[in-house]
From Swiss-Prot:
It catalyses: cytidine(34) in tRNA(Ile2) + L-lysine + ATP = lysidine(34) in tRNA(Ile2) + AMP + diphosphate + H(+). This is tRNA(Ile)-lysidine synthase. GO terms for cellular component: cytoplasm. It comes from the Bacteria. Keywords: ATP-binding, Cytoplasm, Ligase, Nucleotide-binding, tRNA processing. Disulfide bonds: none annotated.
């Protein structure tokens, strides 16, 4: 696994409480420059502030100059009355043997963009990907042997980690963006890494694409159309897998194997893939899935190593157990309070995991009770009610009754401001704390932090 570390942040002068608005991922290249400029023009009379977010990877010797260019450009636009606020973050990439530099840099970039967006109080980040990017993505995924989900390419909009990532120009040809840049005489930088043949996308763009477009002039549009069809097909597969998992009474932590084995093979494999993703397995490979499909019905072995952890069968149930990260030093102090104001993923490194909150119509905790939460360890004597009308019992007995193994009982107990127990990792929401039907509410679940 790999990671990155934010080392510094640079910003133009701003008030202590910056106005809320939206953000644009701004590298300084042609596409993001055009998108930022167009967004500023559209926002000028709306009262919105547009936050230009720049990530300094340090991969190029010119990275400092690019940051300076982006900040200077935003200052010029601000002097012309455009509602821009520039923010930048430096990250240090940490690649390990076998890691893809492209993948590591991309993950670090999105993590930094999310951090910057949260700091500015915005929940919408615009990305400048266009139709050519989508066509290239489909080709790359096909060459990697991807399934329908990979062939779907990049979504036009997706919500992840409490942020909506949108690509408003995904159906726009590259030529239209080039024309926009010429029309407004926009200044942008040329990233020399785009000519580096070590990267697969660059080889495709520089060596394959010219020949492909010469032979098939409509390739960009038709490949993007194919990606849209694949997105619809992938959505159907995902919906069916979700229905199958619900029929199996699966949760994000547990897959009941007896019910799963009743599925037809072509449905079982997609249900298994979806469950693995929900359980926190990082991109299960085709070989992983083939092995599991062959060995799970046979009943042996009891453990399967996967990237980032291992699968374990326990009392007819399948669980994923992340591998402890020996390189991570646990914080000296655990988080003791938390405010959940909306759905999202809340990292709690002191407890070694992530609390996931999702808006639901039933089975959740009243949103009003989540404004002030107390996080506490097990001390003994806690009582948990699993179902309405059933007696509350000790956590030990509830864990045993639910067949939750010891290694799946980590994480904090969540108490409301009135001192009532609301949520227990591995067991869920206490029945006494559940919201009434129709009341705004959030479902909670606990996920161990990924390794690396």
């Amino acid at each position: 696994m790999s990671g990155s570390r934010a080392t510094a942040a640079t910003t133009t002068p701003r008030s202590a409480e910056p106005p809320r608005g939206l953000a644009v991922a701004y590298s300084g290249g042609r596409d993001s420059t055009a998108l930022l400029h167009a967004t500023l023009i559209a926002a000028r009379d709306s009262g919105l502030t547009v936050h230009a977010l720049h990530v300094h990877h340090g991969l190029s010797a010119r990275a400092d100059a690019w940051l300076a260019h982006c900040e200077s450009q935003c200052r010029r636009w601000a002097r012309r009355g455009l509602p821009v606020c520039f923010r930048a973050m430096r990250v240090q990439l940490a690649c390990r043997s076998g890691d893809s530099l492209e993948a590591v840099a991309r993950a670090a970039r999105y993590a930094a963009l999310r951090t910057l967006a949260v700091e500015q109080g915005v929940a919408l980040v615009l990305l400048a990907h266009h139709q050519r990017d989508q066509a290239e993505t489909l080709l790359l995924q096909a060459l990697r042997g991807a399934g329908v989900a990979g062939l779907a390419g990049m979504p036009r909009s997706i919500e992840r980690d409490g942020i909506t990532w949108a690509r408003p120009w995904l159906a726009r040809p590259r030529e239209a963006i080039e024309a926009y840049v010429r029309r407004y005489r926009l200044s942008y930088i040329d990233d020399d890494s785009n000519d580096d043949p070590r990267f697969a996308r660059n080889r495709l763009r520089l060596q394959v694409w010219p020949a492909l477009q010469a032979a098939f002039p409509q390739a960009e549009g038709t490949l993007a159309d194919a990606a849209r069809w694949a997105q619809q097909a992938a959505a159907c597969v995902a919906d069916l897998a979700a229905l199958d998992l619900a029929a199996c009474a699966a949760t994000n932590d547990v897959l009941p194997l007896t019910a799963w084995r009743q599925l037809a093979p072509h449905r079982a494999v997609h249900a298994l893939r979806r469950w693995l993703q929900q359980a926190g397995v990082t991109a299960p490979t085709a070989a992983d899935l083939e092995r599991l499909m062959a060995e799970l019905p046979a009943g042996a072995p009891a453990r399967w190593p996967l990237k980032g952890g291992e699968l374990r069968r326990y009392r007819g149930e399948l669980r994923f157990v992340p591998t402890p990260d020996a390189t991570r030093e646990p914080p000296a102090v655990r988080e003791t309070t938390l405010a959940l104001r909306r759905g999202g993923r809340y990292r709690l490194p002191g407890w070694g995991g992530v609390l996931v909150a999702e808006r639901v119509r039933a089975g959740g905790v009243p949103a009003a009770q989540l404004a002030v939460l107390s996080l506490q360890p097990r001390r003994g004597g806690e009582q948990f009610q699993g179902e309405a009308g059933r007696p509350a019992r000790s956590l030990k007995k509830q864990y045993q009754a639910a067949a939750v193994p010891a290694w799946a009982r980590g994480g904090p107990l969540l108490y409301g401001g009135d001192g009532r127990l609301l949520f227990v990792p591995g067991l869920g929401v206490d029945a006494r704390a559940m919201a009434a039907p129709g009341e705004p509410q959030l479902a909670l679940r606990w996920e161990p932090l990924p390794t690396g």
